[in-house]
A protein has these predicted regions:
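Basic/polar N-terminal segments that are highly enriched at the extreme N-terminus
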Residues: 1-2, 20-24
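Bacterial N-terminal signal peptides that target proteins for export
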Residues: 1-11
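Phosphate-end processing signature that detects enzymes handling 5′-triphosphorylated RNA
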Residues: 23-280
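Bacterial N-terminal signal peptides
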Residues: 10-19
Length: 280
């Protein structure tokens, strides 16, 4: 396989460097707001309750309806990011993440591995097609726009990043694996045979994350399923950040999603200026 990569390398690097003339339409948009950590200071359940109340108020003011989840559909996962010592992935706008479900207080032996090409500018159609063709047959693919609100603490200010990603479930711990091992799963990554032995290790301490669905906002033509992510250090002692988000497919309900997003940004008592989780 590495011999084939060596022959194709110049074309591959050129393909990832140059953007296509036409931009690809995103499969989905994810709206994100960073929640003030003090909202979850007493407990996550109390934080969920406070956010539900805020969502109900915002929905009511916009002529929408909020339906809170009956139970907190909460899942605990260990999150880990990888790169080489010289940040070979980050230099080419890639990130590699693995999530391990927590069972009986311990991370599973295998987790979901996600490779992501992420930029502040839109990706071209040809670039997206190459990304899709270079993924493993069983991987789950998506092209998404991430919209972060309250940039610099100002309501209405937002930052958008575009990402093409593919994930594979039930993968063994990737710590100590190499770029060559990664290329076995994702063959069209833009690395040469000489890079194959570069070792992948965690880029930061692991994170213990609690992910929950807390309800949904409904309006004519669509709905927004509200999700939270609360991140702690690996021991679960220090709260690092919290986030409220929802995803939707671009279409007729775009204006409703934007109106809800703008309304929530007025709650500076609940939401804070911050950064995307992956940039921690």
């Amino acid at each position: 396989m590495l011999e084939l990569k060596r022959v194709a390398l110049p074309a591959i690097i050129m393909a990832w460097t140059l953007c296509g003339a036409a931009f690809a339409a995103t499969d989905s948009v994810e709206m994100k707001l960073q929640v003030r950590k003090e909202i979850f200071a007493s407990s996550r359940q109390e934080g969920y309750k406070i956010l539900r109340s805020a969502l109900e108020d915002a929905a009511l003011n916009l002529g929408m309806k909020f339906h809170g989840a009956d139970d907190d559909d909460e899942e605990a996962v260990m999150v880990r990011y990888y790169d080489t010592a010289d940040q070979a992935l980050a230099e080419k706008d890639f990130s590699l993440r693995q999530k391990f479900k927590i069972k009986d207080g311990r991370p599973s032996d295998k987790g979901t591995l996600t490779i992501k090409l992420r930029r502040r500018t839109e990706l071209g159609k040809e670039e997206i097609e190459r990304f899709q063709k270079g993924m493993a047959p069983k991987s789950e693919y998506k092209y998404e726009a991430d919209v972060l609100g309250l940039v610099n603490g100002t309501a209405g200010n937002r930052s958008t990043a575009y990402s093409a990603s593919a994930k594979l479930k039930k993968q063994p711990d990737f710590t100590g694996k190499t770029l060559g091992d990664l290329a076995e799963l994702f063959p069209l990554l833009p690395f040469s045979a000489s890079d194959a032995s570069a070792v992948l290790n965690p880029t930061a301490p692991d994170v213990l994350a609690y992910e929950a669905d807390i309800g949904e906002v409904k309006f004519p033509g669509g709905e927004a399923e509200m999700e939270t992510a609360v991140w702690y250090d690996a021991e679960g002692k220090t709260l690092e950040l919290a986030e409220l988000s929802w995803k939707y497919k671009p279409g007729k309900s775009d204006e409703s999603h934007r109106a809800l997003f703008e309304a929530l940004q007025q709650r500076s008592d609940l939401f804070d200026a911050g950064k995307l989780k992956s940039s921690r």
